Amino acid sequence: MELKHVLMIIGIIILTIAPLVMYSGLTEEDGYFGGADGAASDLIMELSPEYEPWFEPFWEPPSGEIESLLFALQAAIGAIIIGYFFGYNKAKYDFESKN
């Protein structure tokens, strides 16, 4: 196995384990993988308690699992679209370089 492949695998392992080690022992109240939405709403209420939202969502998912599923589905669709365009451009470049 080439050195660049070994270094890439080591880098992936470090990037996978580092967040888990850095946040081990923290709970969600301490900011363990907390969301930006919750932090933003807390800050808004702290700065301006009389603030009222402009609108309410027309539909809320029935559970947190459904919300996570929809988020993962959105991420997967985005990854497919981005991957398609990278593959299309790579194939186009390869085709043009052969001709």
Swiss-Prot record:
GO terms for biological process: cobalamin biosynthetic process. InterPro entries: CbiN. Pathway: Cofactor biosynthesis; adenosylcobalamin biosynthesis. It is found in: Cell membrane. The chain crosses the membrane at residues 6-26, 68-88. It is a multi-pass membrane protein. Pfam families: CbiN. Keywords: Cell membrane, Cobalamin biosynthesis, Cobalt, Cobalt transport, Ion transport, Membrane, Transmembrane, Transmembrane helix, Transport. GO terms for molecular function: cobalt ion transmembrane transporter activity. GO terms for cellular component: plasma membrane. Its main location: membrane. Part of the energy-coupling factor (ECF) transporter complex CbiMNOQ involved in cobalt import. Forms an energy-coupling factor (ECF) transporter complex composed of an ATP-binding protein (A component, CbiO), a transmembrane protein (T component, CbiQ) and 2 possible substrate-capture proteins (S components, CbiM and CbiN) of unknown stoichimetry. HAMAP family: CbiN. Belongs to the CbiN family. This is Cobalt transport protein CbiN.
